[in-house]
Curated annotation (Swiss-Prot):
Name of the top EC class for this enzyme: transferase
Name of the featured protein: Aminoacyltransferase FemB
UniProt organism field: Staphylococcus aureus (strain NCTC 8325 / PS 47)
Catalytic activity: MurNAc-L-Ala-D-isoglutaminyl-L-Lys-(N(6)-tri-Gly)-D-Ala-D-Ala-diphospho-di-trans,octa-cis-undecaprenyl-GlcNAc + 2 glycyl-tRNA(Gly) = MurNAc-L-Ala-D-isoglutaminyl-L-Lys-(N(6)-penta-Gly)-D-Ala-D-Ala-diphospho-di-trans,octa-cis-undecaprenyl-GlcNAc + 2 tRNA(Gly) + 2 H(+)
Membrane-spanning residues: none
Length: 419
């Protein structure tokens, strides 16, 4: 085996293997994204004795104190169950970094530590991947810890994932809780549609994202941040928009209302109606009243807000391994149409239609108590019967130890002065 720099083609061909469980940050498109952010990129990996790539990683070189911080965001990519391969990689990476002006290195691999069901009960027969964590530590890496909160300096360590293997949309939907099934069906009955946005329509996503940002108070990404991905990832970025055409909805309601009124009139015209028939008439009267109310509201809403209402939108990344929900927004004013539910249901079906076995709802804090900052997010994802995946976390290693000590000392001093 040999540790070496890789060409873009070598790197790209390797990470296309879905069995390697790679992240969308470890794809060739991210090279340009990082370069647009002002960073150099280097592709490092291992080749076997037949010159076949068996490990790869995309590193950003971040200039710091006359040296570089080497950061492989969600890398490296390899068969992490092969501890011998991981051991060799870490040993040879250290040698490389010693010769290439590295201050310190950060790795946050997309590697599983433990697996749980939706109720945080460990899967039977699964063990925590402590061997992998201990291997990093044996090479001088500091583990950032088994965190259970969001950290702006780190990628998420917990995820909610739908495993689609061996399932169909119908069998999967049966595993959802009653609220998820009910709200998806509501959206379908409303006639909510979903389409993919083009780049020149991306402002429609941003409008919903900014509204949600203001409502929820979360730390958001800039417009340029999103456009950087849109422009470099191409068809690996998917931006669905859930919307409703009120004109179509009003027409559908009117047709259903006419049908119910005709049925009610026909039943009323019969003489000597039984108790059972009278109950059916009473039920139809309730449905007619409801439909008339809905028809009036939809007609008024169309007049004031226009016939097309944008309900929810999201940014997704698709790679060889999965479809990953990155970020999203929705309109609170139109939440009765259940736009987010329809968007997720549409994208889950997209996975089935395009051969993906994983639909990743992505981030969770790891604190699953009712007082946690994202308990509502967890409950939403839990309702889809997700499996909870815990990743191994962040690892740091100083390479230029004297300069790293100075760097951390100055950083602590700056933080004290800010207080």
């Amino acid at each position: 085996m040999k540790f070496t720099e890789l060409t873009v083609t070598e790197f790209d061909n390797f990470v296309q293997n879905p069995s390697l469980e790679s992240h969308y940050f470890q794809v060739k498109e991210n090279i340009v994204t990082r370069e647009n952010d002002g960073f150099e990129v280097v592709l490092l990996g291992i080749k076997d004795d037949n010159n076949k790539v068996i490990a790869a990683s995309l590193f950003s070189k971040i200039p710091t104190m006359g040296s570089y911080v080497y950061y492989s965001n969600r890398g490296p990519v390899m068969d992490f169950s092969d501890l011998g391969l991981v051991d060799y990689y870490l040993k040879e990476l250290d040698k490389y970094l010693q010769q290439h002006q590295c201050l310190y290195v950060k790795l946050d691999p997309y590697w599983l530590y433990h697996l749980y069901d939706k109720d945080i009960v460990p899967f039977e027969g699964r063990e925590k991947n402590d061997a992998l964590v201990n291997l990093f530590k044996s090479h001088g890496y500091e583990h950032h810890g088994f965190t259970t909160e969001y950290d702006t300096s780190s990628q998420v360590r917990w995820m909610g994932v739908l495993n689609l293997e061996g399932k169909t949309p119908e069998t999967l939907k049966k595993t959802f809780d009653s609220q998820r099934k009910r709200n998806i069906n509501k959206a379908i009955n409303y006639g909510v549609k979903v389409r993919f946005l083009e780049r020149d329509e991306f402002n429609l996503f941003l409008d919903l994202y900014r509204e949600t940002e203001e409502r929820a108070g979360f730390v958001s990404k800039t417009d340029d941040y999103f456009y950087n991905f849109i422009d470099t990832y191409g068809d690996k970025v998917l931006v669905p928009l859930a919307y409703i055409d009120l004109d179509e909805y009003v027409l559908k309601l009117q047709q259903e209302l006419n049908d119910k009124e005709n049925r009610r009139d026909q039943m009323m015209a019969k003489e000597n109606k039984s108790d059972k028939q009278m109950k059916k008439i009473a039920e139809l009267d309730k449905q007619i009243d409801h439909d008339q109310h809905e028809l009036l509201n939809a007609s008024e809403l169309s007049k004031t807000d226009g016939p097309i209402l944008n309900l929810a939108s999201g940014v997704y990344f698709a790679n060889a391994y999965e479809v990953n929900y990155f970020s999203g927004g929705s309109s609170e004013k139109y939440n009765q149409f259940m736009g987010p539910y329809m968007m997720h249901w549409f994208m889950i079906n997209y996975c089935f239609d395009n051969g993906y076995d994983r639909y990743n709802f992505y981030g969770l804090s790891g604190d699953f108590t009712e007082n946690s900052e994202d308990y509502g997010v967890y409950r939403f994802k839990r309702g889809f019967n997700v499996q909870i995946e815990e990743l191994i976390g962040d690892f740091y290693k100083p390479i230029h130890k004297v300069k790293y000590w100075l760097f951390t000392t100055l950083d602590k001093l700056r933080k004290k002065l800010k207080k």
